[in-house]
């Protein structure tokens, strides 16, 4: 087993996740089996209860793990299915150590950060690194580990020390360290400054870790002079100073790394043997054939981004629009669908509460409704709490009555049902148990009986579940290539509330058809309005399984229907 550790310096959000994912993808393209681990040095057990405004989206895995959004990048780049143990947090490690201490497993010793915490970190890494992530094809050859945060942060010190010990535990020939740093340019001088990188690597080396590679983030390509300076002062071989400047799209990052010979340098450093012929190139191109499909993705993304045709405009009506990372997987799923249909797509962000007259200024209200009316399609993503709910209900009503393509996800399905109950069924006070006071109206969405009302973390209906199609005479079944009643698709879930089973038959009879249910036949998973260009909502989160090479069917349906509407305008 070979280990590649990716650390970051100077500031957070520098791009460690994309660089780690790109490195892993390159190695996988060479025929190697690759897995990934993300270390998050916070005391939370997982990301499940963290604010989307502070942390971005919570990514959900097949096994129900609620994890950092970087694991979504790993899954999309590598096309693998990771587990919750691929995300290590300080909370998980401390919880494990304290539990062992309570059981008396330390035999009366004084339990300390070193060696007990650091030992558990190393044990966890070694155990998870050997778990298959691509079915039953075998143990991974390489594990790429991203250490979250910035080198020197007090929160990450136990992990830094554990990794220092780990390099000798597994052998230096099996351990490679990449450090991602920032090379800024001062506007007045125009010179690439290396001092932040020097200080960052000096801090890292003082902690016992010396990087094999320095990957430098910058706005423009690194000059040779800058590379030489970093090599000289940071104790990194000149060829191992890799420039990672801004590129047109993230799919260009692996290509950029390959152009600077990083794959061969990593193979040499870890004494790895690729499973493909590295000298073979794709027809009429200088790109290696093992990178050709990825280059095709990058080229396709550039093509649709730069095309002169009018783009498809999708109104994203949400609660957390102030931080787009809160919907990162939804954005990526739309991008994947956009590449698949080869048409540029633009997201218009609409804060749901601004659609409610009483909650917004006149200018915000007017602008929000203009964006909604100007869009070719509408998407209502997941969320929690009652803020903006009435705005979402107004959105669903507008989409239904205007014929505009609509996709609702998780909360979006519940919104579609509430809107239909109020305006078609005539149940004026229809609502969700999540938003309404007891006895204030007819709850068409209710709390699931098996979910805890006292504990928030890890208590929802989480992970991959089967959705059984009960009707195949509809658009969504065709998108999933389902042609027989009873066929199942597997998607990931994250919710506490469900459509009230007591109202399903009445609503279905009035035209909002429940075409997908869970394996018990009681829980509603997919609704579709038949006499509509595209009005679909699902209780699951299809965005979590969308891949660049395999776009999610509901998103393909939304963009295709929106494109048809654009053509008619």
UniProtKB/Swiss-Prot annotation:
One GO process term, biological-process aspect: 'de novo' CTP biosynthetic process
Record-linked Pfam families: CTP_synth_N (PF06418), GATase (PF00117)
InterPro entries: Class_I_gatase-like, CTP_synthase, CTP_synthase_N, GATASE, GATase1_CTP_Synthase, P-loop_NTPase
GO molecular function: ATP binding; CTP synthase activity; identical protein binding
Chemical reaction(s) catalysed: UTP + L-glutamine + ATP + H2O = CTP + L-glutamate + ADP + phosphate + 2 H(+)
Superkingdom per UniProt: Eukaryota
Glutamine amidotransferase type-1 domain span: 313-569
Residue positions of the active site: 410 (nucleophile), 541, 543
Entry's Gene Ontology cellular component terms: cytoophidium; cytoplasm
UniProt entry keywords in alphabetical sequence: ATP-binding, Glutamine amidotransferase, Ligase, Nucleotide-binding, Pyrimidine biosynthesis
Biological or metabolic pathway of the protein: Pyrimidine metabolism; CTP biosynthesis via de novo pathway; CTP from UDP: step 2/2
Protein EC: 6.3.4.2
Protein task: Catalyzes the ATP-dependent amination of UTP to CTP with either L-glutamine or ammonia as the source of nitrogen.
Assigned protein family: Belongs to the CTP synthase family.
Protein's UniProt name: CTP synthase
């Amino acid at each position: 087993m070979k280990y590649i550790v990716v650390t970051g310096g100077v500031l957070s959000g520098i791009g460690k996740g994309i660089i780690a994912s790109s490195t892993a993808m390159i190695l996988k393209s060479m025929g190697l089996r690759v897995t990934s681990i993300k270390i998050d040095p916070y005391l939370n057990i997982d990301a499940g209860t963290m604010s989307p405004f502070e942390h971005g989206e919570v990514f959900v895995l097949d096994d129900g793990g609620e994890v950092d959004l970087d694991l979504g990048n790993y899954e999309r780049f590598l096309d693998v299915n990771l587990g919750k143990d691929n995300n290590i947090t300080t909370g998980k490690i401390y919880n494990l150590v304290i539990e062992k201490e309570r059981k008396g497993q330390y035999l009366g010793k004084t339990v300390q950060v070193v060696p007990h915490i650091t030992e558990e970190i190393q044990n966890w890494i070694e155990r998870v690194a050997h778990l298959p992530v691509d079915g039953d094809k075998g143990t991974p050859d390489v594990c790429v580990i991203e250490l979250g945060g910035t080198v020197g942060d007090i929160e990450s010190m136990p992990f830094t020390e554990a990794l220092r010990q780990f390099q000798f535990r597994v052998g230096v020939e099996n351990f490679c360290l990449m450090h991602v740093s920032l090379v800024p340019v001062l506007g007045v001088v125009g010179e690439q400054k290396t001092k932040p990188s020097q200080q960052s690597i000096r801090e890292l080396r003082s902690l016992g870790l010396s990087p094999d590679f320095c990957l430098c983030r910058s706005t423009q390509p690194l000059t040779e002079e800058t590379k030489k300076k970093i090599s000289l002062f940071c104790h990194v071989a000149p060829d191992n100073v890799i420039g990672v400047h801004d590129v047109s799209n993230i799919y260009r990052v692996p290509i950029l790394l390959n152009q600077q010979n990083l794959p061969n340098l990593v193979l040499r450093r870890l004494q790895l043997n690729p499973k493909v012929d590295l000298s073979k190139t794709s027809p009429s191109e200088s790109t290696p054939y093992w990178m050709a499909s990825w280059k095709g993705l990058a080229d396709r993304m550039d093509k649709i981004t730069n095309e002169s045709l009018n783009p498809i405009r999708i109104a994203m009506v949400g609660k957390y629009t102030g931080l787009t990372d809160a919907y990162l997987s939804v954005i990526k799923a739309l991008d994947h669908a956009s590449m698949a249909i080869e048409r540029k797509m633009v997201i218009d962000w609409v804060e749901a509460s601004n659609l409610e007259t009483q909650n917004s200024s006149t200018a915000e209200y007017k602008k929000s409704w203009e964006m909604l009316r100007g869009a070719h399609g509408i998407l209502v993503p997941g969320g929690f709490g009652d803020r903006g709910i009435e705005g979402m209900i107004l959105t669903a009503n507008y989409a239904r009555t205007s014929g505009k393509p609509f996709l609702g996800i998780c909360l979006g399905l519940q919104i579609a049902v509430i809107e239909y109950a109020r305006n078609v069924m005539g149940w004026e006070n229809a609502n969700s148990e999540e938003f309404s006071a007891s006895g204030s109206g007819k709850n068409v969405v209710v709390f699931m009986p098996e979910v805890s009302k006292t504990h928030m973390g890890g208590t929802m209906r989480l992970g991959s579940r089967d959705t059984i199609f009960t009707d195949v005479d509809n658009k969504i079944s065709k998108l999933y290539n389902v042609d027989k009643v009873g066929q199942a698709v597997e998607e990931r879930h994250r919710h506490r509330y469900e459509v009230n089973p007591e109202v399903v038959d009445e609503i279905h009879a009035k035209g909002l058809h429940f075409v997908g249910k869970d394996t018990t036949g009681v829980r509603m998973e997919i609704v579709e309005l038949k006499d509509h260009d595209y009005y679909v909502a699902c209780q699951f989160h299809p965005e979590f399984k969308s891949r660049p090479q395999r776009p999610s069917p509901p998103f393909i349906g939304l963009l295709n229907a929106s494109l048809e509407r654009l053509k008619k305008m």
